[in-house]
Amino acid sequence: RGGKNLVKKVQKFSKVQVIGHLEGLCHIYVDKDANLSAAKKIIVNAKMRRTSICGALETLLIHSKCLKSHGVPIIKKLISSGCEVLVDKKINKIFKNKLELAKKIDWETEYLSPKVSVKSVSSVHDALDHISKYGTMHTDSIISRNFKTAKVFLSRVNSAIAMHNASTQFADGGEFGFGGEVGISTNKLPPRGPVG
């Protein structure tokens, strides 16, 4: 545990396996079959409950088929909750170019503040590709009523903690019955997940 550069250096040069708690660049994917009411509550909790923790939402991925029905009310709810929202061009067009555009660096940034990047994706596979490219293997979640789609997400996302219809902030040792934690191990070898 420590700064990003310290953790990476220790992991790179250690002669023994070390447990690393690195960044928590957490994602939520809103599927076209998501329940809007639940999605708004989950997303606001995931971003705004405690913005500076490693389990806070940093990137929101929304299926392109539900941008108007789900994306617009979710983004408006985030903004009214005090969150700064950065979006891709497709979403900004819906908002008549009134929101700030996300840059490439935003997809790989752990803000630890009331700020979130929002991107439209064409499918669960597109969401998984984005998470694979930019994620930190910490905590990622899908919001969907379609269990088949959720199963694809949960089986393919390479995260220490994968969730379905739950806030990424529900990712501490206490919630899993492990007691207090030192960090979330994103290593592929055990232990993985909350470590106390």
Pin down the residues of each PLM region:
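Active-site phosphate-binding strand-loop segment of PLP-dependent enzymes
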Residues: 1-2
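Short Gly/charged-rich anion-binding patches and loops
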Residues: 5-6, 73, 126, 149
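ALDH superfamily catalytic-core signature
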Residues: 7-113, 164
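Conserved C-terminal structural/oligomerization subdomain of aldehyde/semialdehyde dehydrogenase
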Residues: 103-196
